[in-house]
Amino acid sequence: MRKIVLYVSVVTLLVGAVYFLSYGQEKENAMPVLPKENAQPGPLQGYTILVDAGHGGYDGGARAGVSKVWEKEINLQMAGQFRQALEKAGARVIMTREEDKAFADKKRPDLDARLQMARDGQADMLLSVHMNQYHSAMESGPQVFYRKDQENSRLLSGCIQAAMISRLQPRKERKAMAGDYYMLSLDIPSVLVECGFLSNPEEEKMLLDDAYQKQLAEAVCEGVCEYFALKSTEKME
């Protein structure tokens, strides 16, 4: 009996020694994972973009007709999707808010605070995220707005509008529209993206869907990339 126990103990020690030596050899031969030297930077590398989730706090914005969700909540979700898409493309993203809050008790000071964030962060672009609403439930489709006196913003709005139509294929293909928007009063290209109509039950359902939000954000990012590509081409000419 003692011989059997001794034999089993010796075998166990031998097996353990072989495993230890082979494991040590594997670790010694393992190559560290290094970043690829030829990895290309994203198309938005070097750009800083401010993403503004419209409304917040006491200002709920529009309200969805079916779910009764406030616009401020969906804006925040969508702004997060914008951030992910833009950062994936290499941009540095500044968020005006990442929670339900306002920056002042009145509308104009609240907007001023958001604009100041863009100045302080030396943003190259401003994207303000909103949801639309109309008295008719038939209206649908995303739409981009810009200030009529800003040529770069007009170009940016056209790039984003075209990308959203191409990717999302909405029933109603809207055109980018000019207006007098205080939130877009910076010297940098600035647009207001109305992602869709909360007054349209079908579109409301889409706007609350995570997959659709991601798809829309990727379309916006594509438009932003196209804008900077066009501006780079202008500089080279």
Q: Could you describe each region identified by the protein language model?
A:
Residues M1-I4:
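Positively charged n-region of N-terminal signal peptides that target proteins for export
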Residues L6-S22:
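Hydrophobic membrane-insertion alpha-helices, especially the h-region
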Residues F20-P35:
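Sec-dependent signal peptide cleavage junction
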Residues M31-I49, H55-L156, S166:
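Catalytic-core regions of hydrolytic enzymes
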Residues R63, G121, S128, H135, ...:
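Active-site-adjacent mobile loop/cap segments within catalytic or ligand-binding domains
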Residues R92, K172-K175, P189:
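Conserved beta-strand segments of alpha/beta enzyme cores
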Residues N152-M177:
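Active-site-adjacent substrate-binding region
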